[in-house]
Amino acid sequence: MSEEKDTPLEAFASLKHSGVTPQKVRRIVDLIRGRSVDEALAILRFSPHSASGILYKLIVSAQANYANLLGRDDDLFVSSVYVDEGKTYKRGRPRARGSSSRILKRGSHVTVTLSKEVR
C-alpha cells in the first residue's frame, strides 16, 4: 500500500490592524475575487486606490506561503478574500460654540486565500 501525503490545497495570508477603512478595501477586493493570481496582481498594480498596495503585498505573501509549503509554484487563484472591521479610533473635531463632533478612524483586517481551484 502506498500512502498519499495530504498536500495543502490552500495558502493563507492575513493583515491585521490596517489603517485603511473596510469600505475602501472592499471596493478593490471585489475586483480580484475569483481571478488568477497573475491577473489579480496586474489589476492591483495599475489601480490608483490606496488599498491596492496593501492587497498586492498580501497576495505576494500568500503566494510565497504556498510555494514554501509545497516547494513548487502552481497556477493559483484568489479563492476567497474577506475584509473585517478592525479597531475604530475616535477623534474629536472642534465645532461652533465650543462643541465638538466625533470623527471615526476605522481600521480593517484582511485575509486572502489562494488555491488551485476557485470555490
Curated annotation (Swiss-Prot):
Domain of life: Bacteria
Keywords: Ribonucleoprotein, Ribosomal protein, RNA-binding, rRNA-binding
Xref: Gene3D superfamilies: Ribosomal protein L22/L17
GO MF, one annotated term: rRNA binding
GO BP field: translation
Keyword RNA-binding carried by entry: yes
Gene Ontology CC terms, in alphabetical order: cytosolic large ribosomal subunit
Record InterPro entries: Ribosomal_uL22 (IPR001063), Ribosomal_uL22_bac/chlpt-type (IPR005727), Ribosomal_uL22_bac/org-type (IPR047867), Ribosomal_uL22_CS (IPR018260), Ribosomal_uL22_sf (IPR036394)
Purpose: This protein binds specifically to 23S rRNA; its binding is stimulated by other ribosomal proteins, e.g. L4, L17, and L20. It is important during the early stages of 50S assembly. It makes multiple contacts with different domains of the 23S rRNA in the assembled 50S subunit and ribosome. The globular domain of the protein is located near the polypeptide exit tunnel on the outside of the subunit, while an extended beta-hairpin is found that lines the wall of the exit tunnel in the center of the 70S ribosome.
Family statement drawn from the similarity comment of this UniProt entry: Belongs to the universal ribosomal protein uL22 family.
Assembly with partners or alone: Part of the 50S ribosomal subunit.
Name of the featured protein: Large ribosomal subunit protein uL22
Gene: rplV
